[in-house]
Design a protein with these regions (language model features):
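Structural motif
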Residues: 10, 79-82, 116
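Glycine-rich anion/phosphate-binding loops
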Residues: 58-65, 94-104
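Catalytic His-Asp segment of secreted/periplasmic serine-dependent ester chemistry enzymes
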Residues: 124-202
Length: 202
């Protein structure tokens, strides 16, 4: 495809509804906040948040190629993939082994396509049973990424007992954060290797 600005990096952020900022009255979500704090004077970005409510890793396996193929130019180094992993696998009862395999398959294919990938793990909810699964899932996702040298932002452990996160969830539906919660995720991403992954100076 064409039509972009000269020298821009195109970033597809594929995941669940959190990548689209559901629950944020400002409509920025964590993706918009990260982009707003990313220097673009010398390296412009075109960022495409592509969220589906309750998305699972199986859904991502089926979807990510189609989403990226329609938005990326076939120019080496000009495209990036971000995976925003959510609670979908836990709610759908997907086994930990299958979740690991699904993520591994995406990362391996992206690597074969020379497509740099950045992974953001699932944040906690207010439901203890769901959090039990998310705690294990986040650790598993982190391990899969670590084995492949892919940057992984753990959103679960830093927020599990974070007062501002829990207060923000409590003010909403208990699952989707508001402005404060998305700001916390954005902070974790920005301090989790984001600039280095894009090749930008902080």
């Amino acid at each position: 495809m064409s039509g972009g600005r000269a020298g821009e990096i195109r970033v597809c952020v594929v995941g669940d509804e959190l990548v689209a900022g559901v629950g944020d009255r400002r409509g920025l979500g964590w993706v918009g906040r990260v982009v707003a704090r990313t220097p673009q004077d010398e390296q412009p970005l075109a960022v495409f948040p592509l969220g589906i409510p309750g998305e699972t890793t199986a859904g991502l396996v089926d979807r990510w190629r189609q989403e990226t193929n329609r938005r990326f130019d076939d120019v080496a180094g000009a495209s990036r993939l971000v995976l925003g992993l959510g609670r979908g696998d836990v709610l759908a009862g997907v086994s930990l082994a299958r979740s690991r395999l699904n993520l591994a398959n995406i990362l391996d294919e992206a690597h074969a396509r020379r497509l740099p990938t950045f992974v953001v793990g699932p944040p906690p909810t207010l439901t203890p049973a769901v959090n039990d699964g998310l705690r294990q899932l986040s650790a598993a996702f982190g391990d899969v990424c670590h084995r492949r040298g892919v940057p992984f932002v753990d959103s679960y452990r830093p927020l599990e007992t974070h007062d501002d996160w829990l207060t923000d969830l409590s003010a909403g539906d208990g699952t989707h954060p508001g402005q404060a919660g998305y700001g916390l995720i954005a902070w974790l991403v920005l301090h989790g290797g984001w600039h280095a992954w894009l090749g930008l100076e902080r």
